[in-house]
């Protein structure tokens, strides 16, 4: 997910030990908190459009998602989680500015309250 944000990254520069190798797969975890007045039909469209990216953007090895069902109550309003597995760092680099990804973001933004993204190597 690549969204412009006014929030400052907590740690923009990562230690070398945390940088992805060009051959390692990357997990891209994206959690959404929708606006309280978001139309359920618009949320379903976001679900469909995000999952459709797997067929549109090369280098996505897998994509899975689900809605929060934790009984702990610690989700802070985040309801949807998507996990995209990229073949490697190059695939993620292609994904972020890809026109289909940007089109998805334009569908998402009007109903999005907050987003949380973390990438890691499994």
State the predicted function of each range:
Residues 1-79, 87-94, 120-122:
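Short S/T/G/P-rich N-terminal loop/turn motif that feeds into the first structured element of a domain
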């Amino acid at each position: 997910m690549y969204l412009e944000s006014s929030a400052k990254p907590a740690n923009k520069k990562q230690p070398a030990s945390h940088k992805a190798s060009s051959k390692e797969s990357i997990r891209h975890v994206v959690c959404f908190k929708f606006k309280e007045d978001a139309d359920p039909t618009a949320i379903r469209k976001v679900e469909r459009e995000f999952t459709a990216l797997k067929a549109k953007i090369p280098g996505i090895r897998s994509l899975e998602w689900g809605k929060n069902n934790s009984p702990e109550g610690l989700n802070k309003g985040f309801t949807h989680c998507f996990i995209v597995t990229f073949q490697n760092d190059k695939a993620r680099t292609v994904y972020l500015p890809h026109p289909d990804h940007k089109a998805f973001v334009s569908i998402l933004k009007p109903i999005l309250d907050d987003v949380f993204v973390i990438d890691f190597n499994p």
